[in-house]
Amino acid sequence: MEMKRLGYRYTKDNDEELNKIAKYLADSKPLQAAAEIYSDIEEMKNIMIDGMCHFIFTKVNGEHRDAYGTRASDIIERHENKEKAPSKRKPAFNGTFSYFDLERRDWRCFRVDTLVGLDRDYVV
């Protein structure tokens, strides 16, 4: 199965979310492109556990979107919009990666195959 060839650099093989992402990318992209995107997604996920990062993806309308995101609960608590009803991260997978958007102060997601890149110079 092609998915196995994508491999794992940082996380354990039992990470269900990354397994789904690997399969989705292997089924939708050439192997080299899938491996590069997967590597960035895996690194983003690990950074966002306790930090924040900057990344770029292509929106549905074709525009590039710069995003600053996290999944760290302490950072989310400091940045979430207190005037609005709290939203929650949706665990369902449909080819997307969810993150807390630090500029919009709410949960957002993007399709994993639209990731343009991860800014490794901006990792907090």
For the regions a language model picked out, list residue spans one by one.
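Short, compact, well-ordered microdomains
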Residues: 94-124
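Short basic/aromatic-enriched segments
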Residues: 65
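Acidic, aromatic-enriched beta-alpha/helix-loop junctions
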Residues: 70-106
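Eukaryotic low-complexity, non-globular regulatory regions
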Residues: 2-24
